[in-house]
Amino acid sequence: MADNRRSRVITQGVARTPNRAMLRAVGFRDEDFEKPIIGVGNAHSTITPCNVGIGAMARRAEEALREVGAMPMKFGTITVSDGITMGTEGMKYSLVSREVIADSIETVGGGQRMDGMLATGGCDKNMPGAMMALARLDIPGIFVYGGTIKPGHYKGEDLTVVSAFEAVGQYNAGNLSEADLKGVEENACPGAGACGGMFTANTMSSAFEAMGMSLMGSSTVSAEDDEARDVAAEASRVLMDAVHHDRRPSSILTREAFENAFAVVMALGGSTNAVLHLLAIANTAEVPFDLDDVERIRRKVPVLCDLKPSGRFVTSQFHEVGGTPQVMRILLEQGLLHGHCQTITGQTIEALIGHLPPEPPADQEIIMPFDRPLYPEGHLAILRGNLAEEGAVAKVSGIQQRRISGPARVFDSEEECLEAILADGVQAGDVVIVRYEGPKGGPGMREMLAPTSAIIGKGLGDAVGLITDGRFSGGTYGMVVGHVAPEAYDGGTIALIAEGDTVTIDADQNLLQVEVDDAELERRRSQWQVPRPRYRRGVLGKYARLAASASRGAVTDADLFPEQE
């Protein structure tokens, strides 16, 4: 069949004369109507350094697609900067933007009957939003990452944006001067690219590489290097081959591909958000995958990489010593990666990485050998108990104690919590509860980077636990538990906790428990009332109405027609 198997419905035949007339106005010539139309989903934006370099990548992709005989059609999609909106009401729009990105790319690709899709992204929600769209469209597609930022430098230290968040806590604790606070601010983000540790953006780009939907070695490139533009060109050539062979996401996004993704996320020490986003993509791709699968993989895969936020190194340094392909090769050698999985290139994972050495380079400290891991098990533990019947996600890397039991300090918003921390209202041994920040209650599951960074900055990272039905930034570390489900707005037990209740986090036992008997919890439940929605109109109102539980990825299309399930 011809490569324009979808677009021919708008380019061929007498009846499509008006369609062709409009296409001529955007550059089509007679010979172009037989070519496949490839969408270039362009996430370029001057809102955030994460996306400011993507325009050049999209232009290079356009050029390369023309060179291989395709007709590229570039269109824009949105981004919301997590780092800039962090700690404000604006952060409620962040997770919502994932759905908007998915909807927008799907809408253009479906509406214009495109034959293939090259999606770009930089900031955190760009990645899962784009991949959800590729899964929905199920046309040949590839994701191209905008690249990571390089580290900033101040007084001999490598900086990331998280350094600036932690500096706030250090300053408030009297451990950092105003001049040094300004110095960190001015040097933390030196140029273009996504936040530089193994935070959410770099975690998701690595996961997509492991799934076979991005080019091998592309997930850790630096945005300002020519290599990023070279990746865009090569991705265009690979995509054209996929169009020719009708190689679609449904043949790549298999259950085993998701297992590969989670194995790599664990080995990298990646973001908690990977759990939420990969579950959302699995839901979209109609692949059965849940929190129990995540925990099963965690117990088998050690943390191999010493990367920020809990480690020492940044992603650009990781790239220099082999990056994600090297980690995948180590996992493959240990039988922890499905090497037979197909990729968008038409080759298997094993074919693409089999030539790499099964051990990391000896002259570096970023990637550890399998027999000397940073941690013997994965760092993203799934906790359950009377506080999280559907589950919760704990990030247990970079902490000294894996169990904490203490009095609850209860806050019904992130703002209240941060104010108390900065005013020394949270002490060692406390367990902080931040609720009504879930998918529906927030709405939008805000990331609690400001409170957790303030806790770290005050030197309480190993002494205070924090539990929320919201999320955490990929830059968060410490004794933190997020994605608590059911959320407070749905009447989950987190809504029933009272100030001073004893709450236990036990990562070794996978336990999240409030030490209150069932009778008392039922008494409290009988008095609890569903809060009035914070938003009743607009995109936040729609999201609050449609969002599924965090245990299902907080997607908006999970239960649209329950009566027909």
UniProtKB/Swiss-Prot annotation:
Cross-referenced InterPro entries: DHAD_IlvD/Edd, Dihydro-acid_dehy_C, DihydroxyA_deHydtase, DiOHA_6PGluconate_deHydtase_CS, ILV_EDD_C, ILV_EDD_N, IlvD/EDD_N
Keyword field contains Iron: yes
Cofactor detail note: Binds 1 [2Fe-2S] cluster per subunit. This cluster acts as a Lewis acid cofactor.
Enzyme class: lyase
Pathway participation: Amino-acid biosynthesis; L-isoleucine biosynthesis; L-isoleucine from 2-oxobutanoate: step 3/4; Amino-acid biosynthesis; L-valine biosynthesis; L-valine from pyruvate: step 3/4
Active site residues per record: 473
Binding site for [2Fe-2S] cluster: 50, 123, 195
Keywords assigned by UniProt, alphabetized: 2Fe-2S, Amino-acid biosynthesis, Branched-chain amino acid biosynthesis, Iron, Iron-sulfur, Lyase, Magnesium, Metal-binding
Entry's Gene Ontology BP terms: isoleucine biosynthetic process; L-valine biosynthetic process
Protein name: Dihydroxy-acid dehydratase
Organism: Halorhodospira halophila (strain DSM 244 / SL1)
Gene, per the UniProt record: ilvD
